Amino acid sequence: MLKTEPNDSFLNYALALEFAKANDVHKAIELIENVLLREVNYLGAYYQLGKFYEQIQDLPKAIDTYTKGIAIAKSIKNNKALGELNEALWMLED
């Protein structure tokens, strides 16, 4: 499906999760960063990208990612995503 729809955000997000399962977190990060370049409001990607940054111990990038996601969630009034991102950030800063 990616061959016919290479810019499909959902497909790229799902592929990133598969790379992460295969322990290729750096490839997963690359794919999700590309998703966010194309679709800035893809809120689930901020949470997952932050978690991937935590996995590789890049805490400043994790914090930045969660913070960006929080701003987007507020702007589009997505309280569920806002709560998840706030909690992830809080757990990191605790």
What are these regions (language model features)?
Residues 1, 34-35, 69:
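Canonical positions in the second alpha-helix
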Residues 4, 38, 72-76:
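Structural marker of alpha-solenoid helical repeat scaffolds
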